[in-house]
Amino acid sequence: MYPYSESDAQRLHQEAPKASQLAHSEVDLRSDFSRDRARVLHSAALRRLADKTQVVGPRDGDTPRTRLTHSLEVAQIARGMGSGLGLDPELSELAGLCHDIGHPPYGHNGEKALNEVAAACGGFEGNAQTLRILTRLEPKVVSADGTSFGLNLTRAALDAACKYPWTKTSPDGTINRKYGAYDEDAHILEWVRRGHTDLRPSLEAQTMDFSDDIAYSVHDVEDGIVAGRIDLKVLWDLVELAALAQKGARAFGGDPEELIEGAATLRELPVVAAAADFDASLSSYAALKAMTSELVGRYVGSTIAATRAAARLGEYEFGRMHGELVIRPEADREVRLLKTLAVLYVMDDPGHLARQDRQRDRIFRVFDYLTLGAPGSLDPMYRQWFLEADDDAGRARVVVDQIASMTESRLERLARNASGISGFLG
């Protein structure tokens, strides 16, 4: 396994030893990274993902996939891939658990709406919110002067969870569309990235990122097939496939021909052909599960082999700060094609845009409701931060933090309250 250092295990705030052990208790022999994983697993922020949208809403269907179930799948894939690469399995799993922890209600649609209302305080980005939750907002470790350090994870754990290790504003003033830290959290990111010589994410973070793509494409396609929104026979319909590839290239970038090539290699797999005949029978459910299992193994196994081969050839040093995940072109094409299937068939649903409009309206209403009623409208923890804020931007950030933390059920209850008040006021 990669030799992690004392610096990797450092925490932002030094913690006192536990003082409530019973007499003659065994010493806690867990590693620092095992403790980190436990902190994330027991966090309220992770549990709230159970009521946040993945591709469809958490209340759609009998066996819905939510941000939480998706995160558990990403964590399992990342642990296996990380172990195969010689990375700490606890860190790899933790990265998967954390990867969506900063996402607000309604997924990417909610993220866009919050970015609009947060314009006065520098915008909103789910990945930057993840760092903020882990190091500030999740109540676990508070210093004597009342400063919150969030879960107070180790440096390596925070780095593993950081997909975009740069702030919104680059040193040259360039504004980044995707980023892993708000400008006001730059000092925390600087501490996390100590020892890195470039902007490349840690190898654990790269592993988490591709595990996310695998889970998103394979498992969400499975959901779509069961729900009747996706028919794998499109892989054999070259006319519809060409149209789908064009849409996928526009949505996710790349060449449509690459997606068509991805479909061609998928058609050659017997498990894909068997799953294409899904009819909700017992045998077809088993065939579908066989396909998801084999595809995950296909992409994880090929990536481990390609990455290890490149390292043996001496193309780079191998480890947390010195590694490049190598994804084989065939795997990349297939994953992007499946991701296109997972997303675009939902996006083409006639009710999708109307549903998104309603979601955005709720976020706008709740933001106005909380802002106008603050600090009394805020939860006690956020109320304290609101009162401590130095300016309007800081106070707006606190309101955005609270909305981002909400489950969809709670946001909808508040939106109804906000509608009632605005109706009463005329």
Curated annotation (Swiss-Prot):
Presence of the UniProt keyword Cell inner membrane in the record: no
Entries under CDD domains matching the protein: HDc
GO terms (BP aspect): dGTP catabolic process
Residues covered by the HD domain: 67-217
Ranges for region Disordered: 1-23
Alphabetic keyword roster: Hydrolase
Any Pfam family: HD_assoc
Signal peptide positions on this chain: none
GO molecular function, one term: dGTPase activity
Protein family membership: Belongs to the dGTPase family. Type 2 subfamily.
PANTHER family: DEOXYGUANOSINETRIPHOSPHATE TRIPHOSPHOHYDROLASE, DEOXYNUCLEOSIDE TRIPHOSPHATE TRIPHOSPHOHYDROLASE
Name of this chain's protein: Deoxyguanosinetriphosphate triphosphohydrolase-like protein
Organism: Corynebacterium efficiens (strain DSM 44549 / YS-314 / AJ 12310 / JCM 11189 / NBRC 100395)
Organism classification: Bacteria, Bacillati, Actinomycetota, Actinomycetes, Mycobacteriales
